[in-house]
From Swiss-Prot:
Signal peptide limits: none
Organism per entry: Rattus norvegicus
Name of this chain's protein: Protein FAM162A
UniProt-listed InterPro entries: DUF1075
GO biological process: cellular response to hypoxia; neuron apoptotic process; positive regulation of apoptotic process; positive regulation of release of cytochrome c from mitochondria
Lineage, uppermost ranks: Eukaryota, Metazoa, Chordata, Craniata, Vertebrata
Amino acid sequence: MWSLRGLRLAAGHCFRLCERNVSSPLRLTRNTDLKRINGFCTKPQESPKAPTQSYRHRVPLHKPTDFEKKILLWSGRFKKEEEIPETISFEMLDAAKNKIRVKVSYLMIALTVAGCVYMVIEGKKAAKRHESLTSLNLERKARLREEAAMKAKAD
């Protein structure tokens, strides 16, 4: 019996024999760039085309808004607003925004620590005055009981 591989080899052999006898105009219509690999046809890899001269190493520029100009000043990129060019690169703006983000996060960390220290100091002062949540709740409940008792007497 013929195996599948044997049939494929025989068909390929017949195809090559017939291809030699075919006239040249018909042969030219066939894609000559195809390669035969294990009986399969594949297109050759195309080399990447060189970029055109006008777009090589060109970074798109951005006209900064007033707020973005302030960000550039606060980040220390420029000393005065007059020094800021009319158009800047996105990378410069991103770097300035990242610096501001870091500065704001440091400020928030410092404010959080200062708030914690303030709350600890206030808590210690309240403890010296013997003020606690438990004592405040007991006083409030006692006051509510008195008001309820007075209301019951009045009715």
